[in-house]
């Protein structure tokens, strides 16, 4: 094993021969990892004997940053968790604060949230499944979903002006109602997306090469998945029908009719198929929410979290006070302790919040599903080949930004 000394620190190279086994690095900047994390693999030819994972390459101190910010300035931090479906992260945080302050959210705002969150789920699943296709050599299947994802990003822009890290919505609802352009784009999407999605699905679902590559790759049983605290599509692919939207409904999800798809073997193919069906179910939810969108306000009556109109600021002392407190980050919330979770794009995303009555959280912890999945990764790829390790990581949808908070 080669050794490098730099500033009295000793580094041992991982590219070495240990008896009959070779030890190699998979990451931290390997293109197949789709993120910044490292796996040190001990291999016998192509077969993986053991794996040791490393997190922290993209540490950004999410939690401590949030504990030093006003409540309404924490939303942009949540964008950087699973950035493939950031609106879900944003709204999960908003609902956590609303639970603490016991705010009553108008029905229209709840339905608007459902529409945006399900669009985000579709975008997340399209990215994940198209990357699985790329890792099996099906490059064309990568381009089809991205053209549809672009339409979702355009709808984000109409709501908040951003595309990837959205900072969408506010504590209490939205900053503005859906625009006429958004309505037109959503109607067009609901009309054209199903056909485009089935074209993408037909490229992979019954493709013999794709099936041979993904079936049996990176399996995990329902028992082991539960022991690791798996959630989301990875747990459902193992056969457990747990979904936060059904088990602990929020934002009026109990109003909508949809099914929870589950797999059998918990392998890469099942994870792919579960996400494919979840895209169809998300489309059903969006159609129901949009067709039954209630009248009313798009925001709750909590002026301490909403900038008042300029006319009121200039002519009303109370509005001026609210404006000042919001801009200066002086809005306080009651003393309390809450936990709230939402069904994120890759599983249950939870926020544990402790407030001491100040302008910032006393303690805020994120429950990040990717951190949990990554603990099981070495077990799932042991005995597999290197190519199976790549597919397993893609199908688990491990986002590096969530690993170290």
Q: What do these predicted ranges mean?
A:
Residues 1-405:
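Metal/cofactor-centered catalytic core regions of large enzymes
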């Amino acid at each position: 094993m080669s050794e490098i000394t730099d500033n009295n620190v000793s580094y041992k190279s991982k590219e070495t021969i240990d008896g009959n086994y070779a030890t190699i690095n998979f990451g931290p900047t390997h293109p197949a990892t789709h993120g910044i994390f490292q796996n040190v693999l001990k291999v016998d030819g192509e077969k993986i004997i053991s794996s040791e994972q490393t997190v922290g390459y993209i540490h950004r101190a999410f939690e401590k940053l949030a504990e030093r910010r006003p409540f309404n300035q924490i939303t942009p931090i949540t964008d950087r968790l699973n950035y493939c479906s950031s609106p879900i992260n944003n709204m999960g945080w908003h609902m956590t604060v609303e639970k603490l302050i016991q705010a009553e959210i108008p029905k229209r705002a709840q339905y608007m949230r459902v529409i945006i969150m399900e669009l985000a789920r579709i975008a997340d699943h399209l990215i994940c499944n198209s990357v699985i296709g790329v890792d099996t050599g099906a490059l064309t299947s990568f381009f089809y979903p991205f053209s549809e994802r672009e339409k979702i990003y355009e709808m984000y822009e109409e709501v908040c002006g951003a595309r990837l890290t959205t900072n969408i919505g506010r504590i209490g609802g939205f900053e503005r109602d859906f625009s006429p352009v958004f309505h037109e784009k959503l109607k067009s999407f609901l009309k054209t997306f199903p056909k485009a999605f089935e074209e993408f699905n037909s490229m992979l679902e019954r493709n013999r090469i794709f099936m041979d590559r993904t079936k049996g790759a990176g399996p995990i049983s329902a028992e082991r998945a539960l022991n690791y605290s798996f959630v989301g599509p990875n747990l459902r692919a193992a056969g457990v029908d747990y979904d936060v939207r059904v088990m602990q409904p929020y934002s009026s999800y109990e109003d909508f009719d949809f099914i929870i798809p589950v797999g059998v073997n918990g392998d890469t193919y099942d994870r792919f198929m579960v996400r494919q069906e979840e895209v169809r179910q998300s489309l059903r939810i969006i159609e129901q929410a949009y067709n039954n969108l209630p009248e009313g306000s798009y925001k709750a009556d909590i002026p301490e979290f909403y900038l008042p109109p300029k006319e009121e600021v200039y002519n009303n002392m109370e509005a001026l006070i609210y404006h000042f407190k919001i801009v200066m980050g002086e809005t306080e919330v009651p003393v309390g302790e809450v936990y709230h979770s939402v069904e994120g794009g890759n599983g249950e995303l939870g926020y544990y919040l402790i407030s001491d009555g100040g302008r910032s959280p006393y303690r805020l912890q994120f429950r990040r599903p990717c951190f949990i999945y990554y603990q099981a990764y070495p077990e799932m790829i042991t005995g597999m080949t290197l190519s199976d390790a790549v597919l397993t990581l893609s199908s688990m949808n491990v986002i590096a930004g969530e690993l170290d908070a």
